[in-house]
A protein has these predicted regions:
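Conserved donor NDP-sugar-binding/catalytic core segment of glycosyltransferases
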Residues: 1-42
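A short, conserved alpha-helix in the catalytic core of glycosyltransferases
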Residues: 3-4, 62-113
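Catalytic beta-strand/loop signature of glycosyltransferases that borders the donor
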Residues: 20, 106-118, 128, 153
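Nucleotide-sugar-dependent glycosyltransferase catalytic core
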Residues: 115-136, 169-176
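Alpha-helical elements of Rossmann-like donor-binding domains used by nucleotide-donor carbohydrate transfer enzymes
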Residues: 3-6, 94-95, 137, 177-184
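Non-catalytic, C-terminal membrane-associated alpha-helical segments of glycosyltransferases
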Residues: 151-222
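A recurrent flexible, glycine/aromatic-enriched loop bordering the glycosyltransferase active site
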Residues: 30-31, 42-43, 50-74, 88, ...
């Protein structure tokens, strides 16, 4: 906790800070070295399953995993708190994305160590509950945080990303749950929950978009 607090103090624009999350059952491997999101509509934990030494640098990340993070309260008061619709899965990506729109940063503090049991609540990496609510919340998060033109810009990538995931979960025997989640995501997308577009945030959207593209490369090659 001390290491994360000190990291927040070092970075005045930081909204959140995440610890280095190590797999509880294999303490030589990372569980999460910072959360990232890409134009395919995929969120991912950096270097998951790799050696813990691969994420030693304190640096900016797309968002902090709420499993081991701290947040600056005064920023919550400006941008709003966690969305109750995101009661499970991607709630941390959603709030971190929103903070980025407002010009804040999310940081990774490798000196702060947490041993994490992945999927400790849902029980397994792939199950009906997790599959349905992850796809649901992903659609909802995109709707909330991307202006209409940005959605159009990313649409070809999103179609590929969601199509690939659909095929993946069909092969896992979870295709029905994944598609049901997508449908539910559209159903809960309400205009009053969308982050209001403001001209003062234009450059923040540009920076986010460049990172969304770059993170596709990061996902497969880094």
């Amino acid at each position: 906790m001390k290491e994360m607090v000190e990291a927040l103090r070092r970075h005045k624009k930081a909204f959140s800070c995440q610890a280095r999350m190590i797999q509880f059952h294999d303490r030589e491997k990372l569980d999460d070295g910072g959360n990232f999101y890409c134009s395919l509509g995929w969120g991912f934990a950096r270097n998951k399953g790799k050696a813990i030494e691969t994420c030693e640098k304190e640096e900016k990340i797309f968002s902090s995993c709420a499993g081991a993070a701290i947040y600056r309260k005064k920023v919550f008061e400006k941008i709003g708190y966690f969305d109750e619709e995101h009661f499970a899965y991607l709630e941390d990506m959603d709030i971190g994305y929103r903070a980025r729109i407002y010009g804040y940063e999310n940081w990774y503090a490798p000196k702060a160590l947490v041993y994490h049991v992945g999927s400790g609540t849902s029980g397994s990496r792939y199950n009906q509950f997790k599959t349905r609510y992850s796809s649901r919340n992903n659609v909802y998060m995109i709707y909330k945080n991307m202006p209409f033109l940005q959605i159009l810009l990313n649409l070809p990538f999103l179609l590929v990303g969601f199509g690939t995931k659909t095929l993946f979960f069909v092969l896992k025997g979870l295709g029905r749950e994944y598609i049901a989640g997508i449908k539910n995501g559209f159903q809960i997308s309400h205009r009053e929950k969308k982050v209001p577009f403001k001209l003062e945030h234009c450059m923040n959207y540009v920076h986010i978009q460049v990172e969304l593209w770059y993170n596709m490369f990061r996902r497969f090659f880094m």
